[in-house]
Amino acid sequence: MSHRAVWLPAGLTILLLGCRHQTEQYVLPDQVTDFSALYASNCAGCHGQDGRSGPARPLNDPLFLAVIGKERLRDVIANGVPGKAMPAFAQSAGGTLTDQQISIVASEVEARWSRPQEFVGVALPPYTAELGDAKHGAHVFRGYCARCHGEDGTGSAKGGSVVNPAYLALVSDQSLRTTVIAGRAGQGSPDWRSDEPGHAMSQQEISDVVAWLSAQRPLPGEMAKGGATAP
């Protein structure tokens, strides 16, 4: 018997074993239950590989997680934010993730990045609230925000514009409120407690400044007609 005759069945056996091994490792998309895999394929592109440094709201933010709460976080992941950049991921809402996968993502984000002990005894502002008084919000903005964003919100050497029409068209009123409350630590933006001890914003002031920011959003068609201002 030739060496070739011996190696042929042996090579075929190895090939078949390799194929079977690959088949056994394949997992259907709706059966993936590993958080790292789910996060990498669905969340990291906007929220960053480690929950930070992405274009969207950081998830690796204990204050944000404390304010939004577990149930609301799961709801946003499942149903998204209509009309904005956050899509719905639940299959029941047109997404690709099962209810089990939604729960895995939400619970693991909480388990890995929340720090509830840091907020014991802290009166956190409510995640949602009605818009307040925009006129008074202008005064609040000048007191808390103008130092970095300019008196009219168009920006300064310390911070960018928060009234850019393109920006306001992309974010919801809830997103504005979340940013006012939780800040953006990675960008040097303080939370509602301000960077001055004892000078925290009241719940009414939060609602008022969000109302003022919302009032700067152009009406449909105005941005296309007038053009977006530079940030």
Specify the residue positions occupied by each region the protein language model found.
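Hydrophobic helical h-region of N-terminal Sec-dependent signal peptides
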Residues: 10-13
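C-terminal motif of bacterial Sec signal peptides marking the signal peptidase cleavage site
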Residues: 15-18
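Gly/Gly-Pro-rich "capping" loops immediately C-terminal to redox-active cysteine motifs
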Residues: 32, 36, 48, 52-78, ...
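Bacterial N-terminal signal peptides that target proteins for export
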Residues: 1-8
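Flexible coil segments in periplasmic/lumen-exposed cytochrome c-class electron-transfer proteins
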Residues: 20-25, 29, 33, 40, ...
